């Protein structure tokens, strides 16, 4: 499948359709509840998806309302992060480039960056470099410590209340259960690898 996001979205096709019927009302409700500190995120459902290597990747399925909350927080973070990373766009970093508030899409169109990435590879090869390193960074997402994330978001000057709320959300979304266990286990690390709404 060429678009990994399509697989994630397939789990929610009916939910997205139902949400869309009254999306304005739903979004206003989420906002109102959030402003009153009453919106409570739900635990994520975990799905294990086979990787080409034969290993399994855990994907967190967040309910639609939680996806919107997550996206709203990520938008705030991305805006601040862009101020620090923009100078590296299409020079050292070529993937998942934040498009900015004014864009309809979260990321810059990848095809343009890919052309520049390919040109950069050719330039490096012409300069005598003959090795390429390939990393599976998505495996890293499960190990991101929430205390470390808090530290770096604070360094970015993200509002502390927003960071604390995000950490509470992440704690719930990344918790685990035993198959017969009576309650969730909160381990304080990881960020959901789905939704990929911020990559769409």
Which functions belong to the PLM regions below?
Residues 40, 50-56, 114-117:
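Short linear interaction motifs
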Residues 56-92, 141, 186-200:
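Conserved pre-motif C helix in the palm subdomain of viral-like polymerases
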Residues 74-134, 139-145:
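Active-site-proximal segment of RNA-dependent polymerases
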